[in-house]
């Protein structure tokens, strides 16, 4: 693979995620030279000719900022009845995926450079990201890459990365719900979009996110333990997969759903060195939930339980920390260290 997006850009996205989680600029300073080299590599691939590239029908400025070059894994491991993957998927560029990640990485680099004090570099990355977004929007207006699709990944990704204009975004949200309804509220995403789908659905309707989470049929998270799994499978089909290339039974990618359980279901989010945001979202058929996060200051806890027609919330904030509490339908309050029940 030659710079396969979704994998190779971990060199930018991992330091970015660590900085967002812990607020430590030293991580960015340490990896900045490599991140800049990779960002430049991504920029140089835009608009280039490649022998196995699929025709997109784009020209001019739209083609100039389209990434349609190099081999890539693409979405990888979507359910077989959603997209049957063959060796050809790894032999050709994936312009929808690659342009989306190019725009996303450029936005991350803009934030990184701004945080480190280089305003000119930040603006250059921001401008490149804007051009990539416009190319992406143009691509999604073509018949071959239309937003009118049942492939959930191709709807989740642009919504998660903020790549669409207002009209396209409104259509994509409705089309995603329709795709889920037509697929029986089962997961149709692969490696790249599975970690994003519950976040996107939470923005649309939190109950839609819970409905997908609670699905026990294949493809679905709960189908695995329901069928005796003690690890996370690479393929949604597990041992029944017909593709030997994705037959691992201990492949944690789809386990990324656990982040949503922490930061949305139970609502624990780090927001600075010793400050947290606690914003739980009860829903679905769950009657209780609880999560604990071991911070450097101690354990942060957030939980909720259904009581009668309402909810009982409990939380714990370690010493020398504060938390902004945002409960459903109530104004935010700032809390000092201690244990609380609401």
For the regions a language model picked out, list residue spans one by one.
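Alpha-helical repeat scaffolds
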Residues: 169-179, 213
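Solvent-exposed loop and edge beta-strand segments that line ligand/cofactor-binding
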Residues: 1-8, 83-101, 138-155, 161, ...
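Amphipathic, well-ordered alpha-helical segments in soluble domains
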Residues: 7-14, 101, 105-108, 132, ...
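Alpha-helical support elements that line or immediately flank enzyme active sites
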Residues: 12-25, 154-164, 194-203, 322-324, ...
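Non-catalytic C-terminal accessory modules of carbohydrate-active enzymes
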Residues: 127, 131, 210-342
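Repeat-solenoid scaffold signature
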Residues: 182-220
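Active-site acid/base region of carbohydrate-active enzymes
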Residues: 21-98, 113-160, 167, 267, ...
């Amino acid at each position: 693979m030659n710079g396969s997006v979704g994998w190779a850009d971990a060199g930018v996205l991992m330091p970015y995620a660590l900085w967002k989680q812990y607020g430590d600029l030293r991580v960015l300073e340490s990896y900045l030279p490599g991140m800049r080299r990779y960002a430049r590599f991504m920029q140089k691939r835009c608009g280039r000719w490649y022998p196995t590239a699929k025709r997109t029908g784009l020209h001019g400025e739209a083609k100039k900022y389209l990434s349609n070059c190099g081999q890539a894994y693409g979405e990888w491991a979507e359910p077989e009845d959603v997209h049957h993957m063959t060796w050809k998927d790894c032999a050709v560029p994936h312009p929808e995926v690659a342009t989306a990640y190019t725009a996303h990485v450029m936005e991350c680099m803009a934030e990184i450079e701004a945080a480190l004090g280089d305003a000119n570099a930040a603006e250059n990355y921001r401008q490149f990201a804007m051009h990539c977004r416009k190319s992406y929007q143009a691509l999604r207006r073509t018949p071959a890459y239309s937003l009118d699709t049942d492939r959930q990944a191709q709807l989740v990704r642009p919504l998660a990365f903020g790549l669409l204009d207002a009209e396209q975004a409104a259509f994509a949200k409705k089309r995603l719900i329709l795709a889920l309804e037509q697929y029986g509220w089962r997961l149709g995403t692969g490696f790249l979009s599975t970690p994003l789908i519950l976040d996107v659905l939470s923005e649309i309707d939190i109950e839609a996110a819970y409905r997908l989470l609670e699905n026990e049929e294949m493809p679905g998270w709960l189908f695995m333990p329901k069928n005796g799994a003690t690890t996370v499978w690479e393929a949604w089909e597990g041992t029944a997969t017909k593709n030997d290339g994705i037959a691992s039974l201990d492949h944690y990618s789809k386990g990324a759903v656990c982040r949503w359980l922490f930061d949305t279901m139970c609502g624990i989010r780090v927001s600075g060195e010793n400050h947290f945001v606690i914003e739980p979202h009860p829903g679905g058929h769950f009657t209780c939930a609880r999560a604990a996060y071991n911070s450097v200051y101690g354990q942060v806890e957030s939980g909720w339980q259904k009581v009668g027609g309402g909810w009982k919330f409990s939380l714990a904030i370690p010493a020398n920390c504060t938390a902004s509490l945002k409960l459903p339908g109530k104004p935010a309050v700032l809390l000092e260290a201690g244990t609380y029940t609401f």
